[in-house]
Every structure is written in C-alpha cells, then in structure tokens.
From Swiss-Prot:
Gene that encodes it: dnaA
Annotated function: Plays an essential role in the initiation and regulation of chromosomal replication. ATP-DnaA binds to the origin of replication (oriC) to initiate formation of the DNA replication initiation complex once per cell cycle. Binds the DnaA box (a 9 base pair repeat at the origin) and separates the double-stranded (ds)DNA. Forms a right-handed helical filament on oriC DNA; dsDNA binds to the exterior of the filament while single-stranded (ss)DNA is stabiized in the filament's interior.
Cellular compartment(s): Cytoplasm
Region feature Domain IV, binds dsDNA, mapped onto this chain: 332-453
Family statement drawn from the similarity comment of this UniProt entry: Belongs to the DnaA family.
Region called Domain II, residue ranges: 74-113
Region (Domain III, AAA+ region): 114-331
Main location (coarse class): cytoplasm
Binding site for ATP: 158, 160-162
Protein's recorded name: Chromosomal replication initiator protein DnaA
Keyword Zinc: no
GO-annotated cellular components: cytoplasm; plasma membrane
Binding partners and assembly: Oligomerizes as a right-handed, spiral filament on DNA at oriC.
One GO term of the biological process aspect: regulation of DNA replication
Length: 453
C-alpha cells in the first residue's frame, strides 16, 4: 500500500515539474519495482533515461520518501525488468502502433539513408549542456511526429548535433527496419535539388524526399541566402511531410530567430515544434567524454591526465578528440603506454597559441599583479571573504590563470586556497561575460596582462 502511495506521489511531483511529453516519456514509462531498506528500485526501459531522473527527479523521490516512509529513500535504477514476460511479438505490435511509418513503401537501403552506424544514443555522453536536447531526441525516436515536429536542435560546432541526428535515425531503424529514413546535410540537400533540377528530374526528387517517414537535416543554416527556388522547394518538402505527420528534425549553429537570409515562413515553421539548444560540455562531462574516447585505444590515460585535458579544452568535443589524436601519435612514436600529464602537455602545446608564455607564467605571479592592481593581498584572494573588491580580484586572477597558463582547473583551484574546479569555471565565465559588457574592466585586465608578461 505504501509503495503505491509513494509512487503516485512521485508521479504527481513529476507531472508538475515536466512538460506533458517529457512526463509521458520519462515518468509514465518508468515503474517502481520495490522499496526495501530505504532503497527504491525503479525500472527504466532505457539507460539514457537515468540522467533525467538523476538531474530532475531525484529530489522528489527524497521528498516523497519522507512524506510516505518518514525516511530518506535512495533511488536505484535498473534497465531490465525482473521476470519480464512481455513477448517480442507484443513489443513489436506496440512499436508499430506508436510509429507513424509507411508500411506500403519499399524501405531504403541503409547505405542510402546517409546515416553513420557508429552514432547511437548508447555512446552519446549526456551532461547538463545537452540533457534536454537528448531527452527530446529520445522522445522523437519513441513517437514519430507525435511529440515534437519539427524538432530543432541548435548549438556551436562539435557539440554533438550530428551525433544526435544519426542516433535518432539509427534508433528508428532498430525498432522499425522498414521505416524510410534519410539523413542529409542541408548543403547536400541543396546540391541534390539543383542536380535534379538541371536534369529535369524534379518528380524523382519530390518522390524521394516526400515519401520519407523521417527527414534529418543537418546544418540548416546553409539554406540561408540561397535562391528563392531552393528555399521554395525545401518549404514545399517540409509542408508535404508535416501535413502527412512525418517527422522532421533539423540542426543549426543558431536558433531559428537568428537565421538571417531565410524566408520568414520557413523560420516560422522551424519553431512549430520544439527548439532545444546544446551548450559546451561542463568539466565533469568533458571527463566522461575523454574516458569514453580513450578506453579502447590501448593506452593508460591516468585520471589526473584526463582532468588536465578536460581543463584545457572547454569549447567543444572536437578539440578533445583532436588532443587525443595528438597524444596517441606521440605515444606511438615514443612507444609508451602510460599517458601522463607531461605527455599530454607536450601533445597540446602545438594546439595552443602563445604557449611559450603560458608555460612560464606561475599562478602566484598572476595573483601578485592582480592583488597589486586591486589592493588585495594573496591571502585574501585565497580566502573565502566575499567583500566585493576581494571577489573581483579573486575572479580576475582565476580568469587570467585559466587564460595565461596551461594548468588544469583543479590545479588552479588548489592555488586559490583549495577552491573547487567549478569555482574556477564560474569565475572564468563571469569575467569573460563582464569583459564583453564593461570596457573599463577589459582595459584593466589588459593592463594587468602587460605587467604579468
């Protein structure tokens, strides 16, 4: 009886917190298996759902636990239901009901879908910067054109947009092999249109794209500034698919409202469904990405080396991948297996500008010059006092330590009285943002830089 009350309370809280579609996907599909010794065992049909439960719903489990059991209940997630008797035939029938696909049309050979098999949800690393985009992508892969249509995902280069597009397509084909799926960069779509137009084969072009169950368009910003006829054809393709309740997923390097050179009617349609952004990965996510990328390379990347690398590249995943490639090249040449910070530093030296300066500037020199400028002692800088002038000096010094040295975030934090790496990240982001808004602060920091160098 208590278990039922406990679970119903969790669902009530979840319904208040999540959107309807997110609630249907994450909460309704979950199942409470048992509560035993203050541990709630919760079945999730997909491992990717765990992060949303951890990030968004864990606290409501605790609240519900105190309400019903007068105890702190800890969740434990499982992904295989105990003694699951559901037959594969029943599962398949359920899937066929959920997906709005075209069973009468001939399926597309995988080689013609444009998808890359290596990109799946299983190997996509989730973090705070992409959790909602991943959640939306998963929802789309469960309910084609019933949840978000179109789904528009935007963010900078190297953040995983292409990976997510492919993951959606691969997931659909895993569940329904006959679904008609096409992944294509916008530039390739444009070229395909122009080729068919030149050859007088527009009917063939229309049949190819307008008979799809799922159209995945990457880098839709490439359509900006193109001729009216090109935008007109994409507009008609979009309408044809949307009217037939076929799923469309688009990615871009900017949000729909910032897409210049596109007809307003297209921009409006891009906003019909759901728009989600992906931001650069945080420190913990970068470490998880590095662990995933390095675990099968045959080298021993020490934990402090991974932390060092995660502290060096914070803009996108491609920089991390490039650094790993450089490191493994050096390791191969030197015939070594253990990757230390020294090896990593040697590898990324060429990837950093002004490294000769970065390597010789000690953090205490930065602290001294910043302290002299703002009238703050190094002891105060390393302390925890929150006076405005001390906080500013501390954050500026952390910012410059990040900009002018190749020290890892944990190392910088340690030099400021054992501060956590997240404090360094916050300080760097704060000062970087203020510099863009405050010319006086920008000039002050430039002046300090000259004294340091």
């Amino acid at each position: 009886m208590k278990e039922k009350q406990f679970w119903n309370r969790i669902l009530e809280f979840a319904q208040e917190r999540l959107t309807r579609s997110m609630y249907d996907f994450y909460a309704i599909q979950a199942e409470l298996i048992k509560v035993e010794e203050n541990v709630a065992t919760i079945f999730l049909p997909r491992s990717e759902m765990e992060m949303v439960w951890e990030k968004q719903l864990k606290d409501i489990i605790v609240v519900a636990g105190f309400e019903i059991y007068d105890a702190e209940i800890t969740p434990h997630y499982i992904f295989t239901k105990p003694q699951d008797t559901t037959s594969s035939q029943v599962e398949e029938a359920t899937n066929l009901t959920l997906y709005n696909y075209s069973p009468k049309l001939v399926s597309i050979p995988y080689s013609d879908t444009g998808l890359k098999e290596k990109y799946t949800f299983d190997n996509f690393i989730q973090g705070d910067g992409n959790v909602w985009a991943v959640s939306a992508a998963l929802a789309v892969s469960e309910d084609l054109a019933l949840t978000y249509n179109p789904l528009f995902i935007y963010g900078g280069p190297g953040l995983g947009k292409t990976h997510l597009l492919n993951a959606i397509g691969n997931e659909i084909l895993k569940n329904i092999p006959n679904a008609r799926v096409k992944y294509i960069p916008a530039e390739s779509f444009i070229n395909d249109f122009l080729d068919h137009l030149r050859l007088g084969e527009m009917e063939k072009f229309k049949k190819t794209y307008r008979s799809l169950d799922l159209l995945l368009i990457d880098d839709i910003q490439s359509l900006s500034g193109k001729k009216v006829a090109t935008q007109e054809e994409f507009f008609n393709t979009f309408n044809a698919l949307h009217d037939k309740q076929k799923q469309i997923v688009l990615t871009s390097d900017r949000s729909p409202k910032h897409l210049e050179g596109l007809e307003e009617r297209l921009v409006t349609r891009f906003s019909w469904g759901l728009t989600q952004t992906i931001t650069p990965p945080d420190f913990e996510t970068r470490i998880a990405i590095l662990q995933s990328k390095t675990e099968h390379l045959g080298y021993n990347f020490q934990s402090d080396t991974l932390e060092y690398l995660a502290g060096q590249f914070d803009s996108n995943v491609r920089d991390l991948e490039g650094a790993i490639n450089d490191i493994t090249l050096i390791a191969r040449v030197k015939k070594i297996k253990d990757i230390t910070i020294d090896i990593a530093a040697e590898a990324i030296r060429a990837r950093k500008q002004d490294v000769s300066q970065m390597l010789v500037i000690p953090i205490d020199k930065i602290q001294t010059e910043v302290g002299n400028f703002y009238g703050v002692s190094i002891k105060e800088m390393k302390g925890s006092r929150r006076l405005q002038n001390i906080v500013l000096a501390r954050q500026v010094a952390m910012y410059l330590s990040r900009e002018l040295t190749d020290n890892s975030l944990p190392k910088i934090g340690k030099e400021f009285g054992g501060k956590d790496h997240t404090t360094v990240i916050h300080a760097h982001a704060k000062i970087k943002s203020l510099i863009d808004q405050d010319d006086n602060l920008r000039l002050e920091i430039e002046s300090i830089k000259k004294k340091i160098k």
